[in-house]
Each structure stands twice: as C-alpha cells, then as structure tokens.
Amino acid sequence: MSGTLPLAMTASESFVGMQVLAQDKEVKATFIALDRKLPANLKVPYMKNAKYRTCICPSSNHLVDDCVCEDVIIAYTAHRNNAVAALLYSDGNVIHRSGTLKPKSQNRFDLRGFLTSVNPGESSKAEAGTSKSTQKAYDRKDKSPSKGKNSKKGGKKSSSERKRKEYSSNSETDLSSDSDANTRKSKRK
C-alpha cells in the first residue's frame, strides 16, 4: 500500500446528505415530553440512494428496520429522511432529466406519526384511516359522470349493458312466475 490517503468525496459525490429540520412548536413539545435538550439546529443525515439505505445513527452499521438507537427522535427523522431521499433520488435519477433532484433545505417532519405508533389512538388521522384530501378525491370520482361514448342520452348501449338488463329482467320474471305458480298450487289445495 502506498502512504497516501484517498481523497475525500465532494458533497455531490457523497451518498450521504445533510438536511436541516425546522423547529416548530410540535418538535419542541416532543423534545420536552421526552425530557431531551433541544439542539441549536436539527441537522439530520439522509441517504441519497436506496441501494445504500443503511441506518445512519451513532450505533454500528445496520439496516433501518434493525435500529437500536436510544436517541429516538434523531433516529426516527434519519430513517424518515432515508425513505424520502430514496424515493426522490432513486426514482428521480431514472425519470428526471437533470439526473438528481435536490432535497428541500428545510423540512418539517410529522413526529406525531411516530408517537402514535408507540401510543396508538392519539392521532385523529390514524383513526380516520384516510386523509381528507384522499377522501375528497374519491368523492369527486364518484360524482363525476362517465365520459365514454355511450354516456350520452339516446346513445347506443354496449352489449354487456344489454345483457345485464336482459338477465335482470329475466330473473325478475322467473321470480314472479315462481310466486304465481306457488299461489296457484296453494289455491288448488
């Protein structure tokens, strides 16, 4: 081996980036609740590529799912960053022309999602199952008229629609004829 050390990677070559988290009331309240000192700025590392998505917490190298880090908030935000960055960079490299999508300089993470997984039943979002925006989208789809060729009044009906109507009318007549036959039998007796 030669006596020279390898050159350090530049920020653009590195697989690890740093992201600053905004300190809002929710973050401060969470740190106070966990009896931890709030750092001056919440800088959290994240992985730029899903291929390298190991956990970035102070303990030894392991996957995100196997994390045993005691600093819950920093570990959680690092993991969340891993997942977000993996989506942005891995899929973005394939689709986006520039090759890389730059992360936002500041991001606010919803720590309630993590805390409700520890203490379920605290979040109304978790209880609802779907967000309001998702529900509105479903409602819009239900209300919007179909835009097919056959949706106009007086237009031709498709063969499947005709068959469905024929089947339903046949089944109704069968039921009515059965009930008529039963009433006739009872009258004869």
UniProtKB/Swiss-Prot annotation:
It comes from the Viruses. Pfam families: Pns11_12. Residues 158-167 have a biased composition (Basic and acidic residues). Its main location: host cell. GO terms for molecular function: RNA binding; zinc ion binding. Keywords: Host cytoplasm, Metal-binding, RNA-binding, Zinc, Zinc-finger. Belongs to the phytoreovirus RNA-binding protein family. This is RNA-binding protein. The lineage of its organism: Viruses, Riboviria, Orthornavirae, Duplornaviricota, Resentoviricetes.
